């Protein structure tokens, strides 16, 4: 009794759907591999699950090259059946360069993880010692850079301190010169203020005495007896007898 025909529709049961996907996917990948080997065909298979997971198979060494060939066949000029030697050489060189870059990238990724302390299990003793030396060298360089940076900051602060001290010194000198300048322009200013009243009083007295001093006259203008003149001179000038020497002598009054 033969199998009945299976109706093609979406399987509603989630578990059955996943089991069916795994079986059909493995069978499809196996058929693609058999087709490429038996018929010497270039086969490329790309499968995405409902969760977005990728499954692929390519009979050639590069899936990208197969996709580029597919794109050229559909959207570009027809590719010649037999490629030239130059094209094969360029393609081989590009592929080798890609493999070298990929290997270098993987090595750098491993080194970075090892420096972060990850994936250290597969490393041998020598590799661990080399990693330790690299870390020590990196720490020394970092400490040297930090020390140099701190020294540079210290030198800058010291330079600023010297500049501020010089500025402060200059301002102090200017302030001291500002206080001394009025004294240099009038050093006896206090004496003038102190003796101002006394000087005015003395000047008034001198002018008063000068007003009542006797006038010096020629001998021919003097009149009266000599004795009376001498008596008036000995008595000294005053407000009452200042003009006695000038008055005419009256003999009748004696």
Curated annotation (Swiss-Prot):
Q: Where is the MADS-box domain?
A: 3-57
Coiled-coil segments: none
Q: What species was this sequence derived from? A: Sinapis alba
Q: Which GO terms describe its molecular function?
A: DNA-binding transcription factor activity; protein dimerization activity; RNA polymerase II transcription regulatory region sequence-specific DNA binding
Q: Name one GO biological process term.
A: positive regulation of transcription by RNA polymerase II
Entry-linked Pfam families: K-box, SRF-TF
Cite the entry's keywords alphabetically: DNA-binding, Nucleus, Transcription, Transcription regulation
Lineage at the top is: Eukaryota, Viridiplantae, Streptophyta, Embryophyta, Tracheophyta
> Which Gene3D superfamilies is this protein grouped with?
Transcription factor, MADS-box
Compartments reported by the entry: Nucleus
The K-box domain extends over 91-181
PROSITE patterns xref list:
K_BOX, MADS_BOX_1, MADS_BOX_2
What name does this protein carry?
A: Agamous-like MADS-box protein AGL9 homolog
Q: What is its main location?
A: nucleus
């Amino acid at each position: 009794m033969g199998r009945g025909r299976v109706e093609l529709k979406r399987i509603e049961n989630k578990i059955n759907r996943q089991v069916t996907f795994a079986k059909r996917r493995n069978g499809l990948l196996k058929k693609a591999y058999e087709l490429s080997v038996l018929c010497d065909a270039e086969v490329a298979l790309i499968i995405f699950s409902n969760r977005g997971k990728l499954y692929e198979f390519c009979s050639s060494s590069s899936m990208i090259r197969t996709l580029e060939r597919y794109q050229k066949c559909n959207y570009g000029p027809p590719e010649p059946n037999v490629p030239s030697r130059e094209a094969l050489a360029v393609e081989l060189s590009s592929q080798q360069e890609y493999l070298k870059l990929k290997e270098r990238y993987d090595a750098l990724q491993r080194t970075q993880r090892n420096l972060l302390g990850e994936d250290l299990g597969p490393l041998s003793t020598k590799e661990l010692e080399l990693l330790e030396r690299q870390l020590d060298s990196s720490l020394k360089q970092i400490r040297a850079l930090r020390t140099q940076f701190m020294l540079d900051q210290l030198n800058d602060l010291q330079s600023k301190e010297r500049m501020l001290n010089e500025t402060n010194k200059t301002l102090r000198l200017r302030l001291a010169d500002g206080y001394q300048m009025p004294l240099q322009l009038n050093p006896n200013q206090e004496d003038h203020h102190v003796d101002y009243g006394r000087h005015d009083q003395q000047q008034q007295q001198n002018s008063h005495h000068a007003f009542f001093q006797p006038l010096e006259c020629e001998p021919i203008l003097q009149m009266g007896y000599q004795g009376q003149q001498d008596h008036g001179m000995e008595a000294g000038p005053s407000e009452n007898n200042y003009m006695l020497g000038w008055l005419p002598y009256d003999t009748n009054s004696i």
